[in-house]
C-alpha cells in the first residue's frame, strides 16, 4: 500500500473511533452533565 493510502485509512479510523465514542457517551450517559441534562 502507498503512504497516502495508509494515511487516509488512519484518518478514517481515528474519525470512526471519535464518532463511536460520542455515540457511546450519548447512549450510556458516561458524562454527569449529559446525565443531568437527560433527566
From Swiss-Prot:
GO terms for molecular function: toxin activity. It is found in: Secreted. Disulfide bonds join 29-35. One of its GO terms (cellular component) is extracellular region. Keywords: Disulfide bond, Neurotoxin, Secreted, Signal, Toxin. Residues 1-20 form the signal peptide. Expressed by the venom duct. Probable neurotoxin. The cysteine framework is C-C. This is Contryphan-Cal3. It comes from Californiconus californicus.
Amino acid at each position: 500500500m502507498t503512504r497516502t493510502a495508509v494515511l487516509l485509512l488512519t484518518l478514517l479510523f481515528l474519525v470512526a473511533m471519535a464518532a463511536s465514542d460520542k455515540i457511546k457517551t450519548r447512549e450510556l450517559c458516561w458524562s454527569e452533565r449529559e446525565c443531568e441534562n437527560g433527566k
